[in-house]
Amino acid sequence: VFLSNLCKKNLIRPERVCFEVSPIVLDETDGKAAETIKELTELGFHVMITGMGGSCPILKLGEFRADYVMLDPYAAVISADDERSLTCLKTVLNLCDELRANPIICDISDKSQLKTLKELECSYYTGKLSGTFMAEKYVRSRNADDEKSDS
């Protein structure tokens, strides 16, 4: 509200103002930065997250040949009703698929989360609804199967 009033006082349209935000905000856990950014955009201001790239773990994922990628527990709490967050999760799952790594979502605690994951075709998850344990020797990696079929 302070920024909005300041812009009005100085005859500056909010859509002409862009706030530069460090990617560190993506690591926040209390939701305050996300809420502030949402409020700013609702007032007409623009927000630009800078520095995405070099230190971003998702961009470095291609350097590692992993059979599985365990996603942060935050992925489990994404609601099917939150379209933007769901789009981000779909993108990460598609990236894992392109890299031939099976994504694992951890801390699944309710049926709605499980339903959302099944709709996204995510087969691996942990938590109280995760099912039964299977010994590692019975789990074949997708990469090993691909190497056999390439021969």
Language-model region placement:
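Well-ordered, non-membrane alpha-helical segments in soluble/globular domains
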Residues: 1-5, 33-34, 89-90
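Residue-level signal for alpha-helix termini/capping positions
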Residues: 8-11, 41, 62, 97
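EAL-family c-di-GMP phosphodiesterase catalytic domain
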Residues: 16-29, 45-151
